[in-house]
Amino acid sequence: MFAMVNGLRSYSQQAIQAARYIGQGFVVTLDHMNRLPMTIQYPYEKLIPSERFRGRIHFEFDKCIACEVCVRVCPINLPVVDWELKESVRKKQLKNYSIDFAVCIFCGNCVEYCPTNCLSMTEEYELSTYDRHELNYDQIALGRLPVSVVQDPTTQTVSGLNYLSKGVMEGHPDSRSVTNF
């Protein structure tokens, strides 16, 4: 008889503890209902990238001296530099320059080590296509400057995530670790 009463008491204590945990979760849910949404409605609102953002690479054909430093410092030897040697002036003349952004890891080494600064990083990050071969940019496509997010009339820009009510989110004050069962 005592075993049955002890079992019933243990069961009721576990049920009450489970109800408390469910109640704590519900309090957290209610606490978040008063906050502004944290998501950005992407196609209509765009986040302005920082100045150091590493987006698509911009290339200036006239500045390039075909030294191939960008190929040597690239961890995956990605830029393809085609050149021919002009015998009359004994200099390399650039014929073609291309980068495949389907393979590029956007490390920025090519931009950093370029001696003539013909490469630069833009703030363009929308590189999605249905065919991966469209991501192989030649010198003409690399030379086009993208439309700035601030100048795009179809979108609303968000300068950062500082529109949240409390700034950086912190844990719930009543949160406990779930180590005791």
UniProtKB/Swiss-Prot annotation:
Metal-binding in keyword set: yes
Bilayer topology: Peripheral membrane protein
Enzyme Commission no: 7.1.1.-
Required cofactor(s): [4Fe-4S] cluster
Protein localization: Plastid, Chloroplast thylakoid membrane
Cofactor note (record): Binds 2 [4Fe-4S] clusters per subunit.
A molecular function GO annotation: iron ion binding
Domain annotation 4Fe-4S ferredoxin-type: ranges: 55-84, 95-124
UniProtKB keywords: 4Fe-4S, Chloroplast, Iron, Iron-sulfur, Membrane, Metal-binding, NAD, NADP, Plastid, Plastoquinone, Quinone, Repeat, Thylakoid, Translocase
Superkingdom of this protein's organism: Eukaryota
Residues binding [4Fe-4S] cluster 2: C74, C104, C107, C110
Reactions accelerated catalytically: a plastoquinone + NADH + (n+1) H(+)(in) = a plastoquinol + NAD(+) + n H(+)(out); a plastoquinone + NADPH + (n+1) H(+)(in) = a plastoquinol + NADP(+) + n H(+)(out)
Primary site of residence: plastid
Gene3D superfamilies in the cross-refs: 3.30.70.3270
Single GO biological process annotation from the record: photosynthesis, light reaction
InterPro entries, alphabetized: 4Fe4S_Fe-S-bd (IPR017896), 4Fe4S_Fe_S_CS (IPR017900), NADH_quinone_OxRdtase_chainI (IPR010226), NDHI (IPR004497)
GO cellular component: chloroplast thylakoid membrane
Residues annotated for [4Fe-4S] cluster 1 binding in this entry: C64, C67, C70, C114
Enzyme class: translocase
Family (UniProt): Belongs to the complex I 23 kDa subunit family.
Assembly, per entry: NDH is composed of at least 16 different subunits, 5 of which are encoded in the nucleus.
Biological role: NDH shuttles electrons from NAD(P)H:plastoquinone, via FMN and iron-sulfur (Fe-S) centers, to quinones in the photosynthetic chain and possibly in a chloroplast respiratory chain. The immediate electron acceptor for the enzyme in this species is believed to be plastoquinone. Couples the redox reaction to proton translocation, and thus conserves the redox energy in a proton gradient.
Protein name: NAD(P)H-quinone oxidoreductase subunit I, chloroplastic
Naturally occurring in which organism (per UniProt): Angiopteris evecta (Mule's foot fern)
Gene this protein is translated from: ndhI
